[in-house]
Amino acid sequence: MKKATVICDMQFGSTGKGLIAGFLAERDQPDVVVTAWSANAGHTYINREGRKWVHCMLANGIVSPKLKAVLIGGGSQMSIPTLISEIMGSLDILQGKSILIHENACIIQQRHVEEEAGPMTKIGSTKKGCGAAMMEKIRRNPESKIVAKDFIDDGLEIPDFKLDGTVGFKDISRHFEELGVCIKVVSNEVYLAVLHKAERVQVEGAQGFSLGLHNGFYPYVTSRECTPAQICSDCNVPISMVDKVVGTMRTYPIRVANRFDDEGKMVGWSGPCYSDQTELTWEQMGVTPEKTTVTKLTRRIFSFSRMQTRQAMLVCMPDEIFLNFANYCASEDELASIIEVISNEGGDVSYIGWGDSAAHIETTLEGDWSDDTNPLFNQYNKSSNIA
């Protein structure tokens, strides 16, 4: 049965996946939302009332009015302290809901963070331990505790979690049961049963197409692919279940910050751009510099690329495009020219983002759910940023 929407980033990340995910979840009302994120990037959603969610572990689709379950796929690299913090921040909307972690989801531990803090990191990594944890999982050492099912009884490193004795998922489950939220590590069989019984599913990807291990500028890439096919694989979502792919883009793509030591020497370059792109400065743009959600470092910013658009379209083949940061364009003609490039490469710009909240999303879909009055260019031009 076709019932799943997949959200994927068509550039270098930070295109507003969290924003469109929250918007679509409130509109489409999925009962199951799915991710297989790593704890190295934040996804932000601000609703129409101004409430803000910044998530690295929980899908932004938790705002769905019909939510029943949040699935965290086996392809995830999880930070359990981060997960706990995010649940605590949304206890009101998670009452009576289930957070189900696939038994083979990877658990980041302090040794992984320490490993990435060393000389292996020369490519502008967020240094959250995600790549190191993934490598340990791939090594498949039977004596290694690395996936969720290894920590049912104990072994979790959660310094701020107030429990007596050793901490395992059973302890966490009991703690949150008293708070009205079900959180469990589940078998593949149970995970699949919940997925297939869902009426509507929303699947949220991370990072971006041009950061993909195979499609990106190797070695200046992330540790896996960022395509709809990879997102579905990491979440155990059958391709045949997908009836819509929503690709996210921005008018001026970004890359994460370069890394510098205490003396100002560059020790980590985040990588190149496409040959038809130019790296710009925030001063040239005339907007407040953006900082990454997790590391709080200033992002690099580039001009729009037809080459990037073409390659992402050919691999991701989205049904709809969310074009974000329209407020960064200097004129309506500039915005129109970017939309024309996307259209000429086969993309359908169905949503336009003018600011940092759901109230700033304009939809071009006839009869779609939107504000009574759409945002105006002059009102939002260069007025706000999205994390």
Swiss-Prot record:
GO molecular function: adenylosuccinate synthase activity; ATP binding; magnesium ion binding
Residues at which ATP binds: 14-18, 42-44, 207, 324, 327
Binding site for Mg(2+): 14, 42, 293
Name the record gives this protein: N6-succino-2-amino-2'-deoxyadenylate synthase
Cofactors named for this entry: Mg(2+)
SUPFAM superfamilies xrefs: P-loop containing nucleoside triphosphate hydrolases
Record GO biological process: 'de novo' AMP biosynthetic process; IMP metabolic process; purine nucleotide biosynthetic process
Catalytic residue positions: 14
Involved pathway(s): Purine metabolism
Binding of dGMP, residues: 14, 40, 125-126, 140, 222
Entries under InterPro entries matching the protein: Adenylosuccinate_synth_dom1, Adenylosuccinate_synth_dom2, Adenylosuccinate_synthetase, P-loop_NTPase, Phage_PurZ
Residues given in the record as L-aspartate binding sites: 293-294, 299
Similarity annotation: Belongs to the Caudovirales PurZ family.
EC numbers, comma separated: 6.3.4.25
Primary role: Involved in the synthesis of the atypical nucleotide dZTP (2-amino-2'-deoxyadenosine-5'-triphosphate). Catalyzes the condensation of aspartate with deoxyguanylate into dSMP (N6-succino-2-amino-2'-deoxyadenylate), which undergoes defumarylation and phosphorylation respectively by host PurB and guanylate/nucleoside diphosphate kinases to give dZTP. dZTP is integrated into the viral genome instead of adenine by the viral DNA polymerase. This Z-base probably completely replaces adenosine and forms a triple bond to the opposite T-base. The resulting non-standard viral DNA is called Z-genome.
Domain of life: Viruses
Keyword terms, alphabetized: ATP-binding, Ligase, Magnesium, Metal-binding, Nucleotide-binding, Purine biosynthesis
Reactions catalysed, as given in the entry: dGMP + L-aspartate + ATP = (2S)-2-amino-2'-deoxyadenylo-succinate + ADP + phosphate + 2 H(+)
Pfam families, alphabetized: Adenylsucc_synt
SMART domains: Adenylsucc_synt
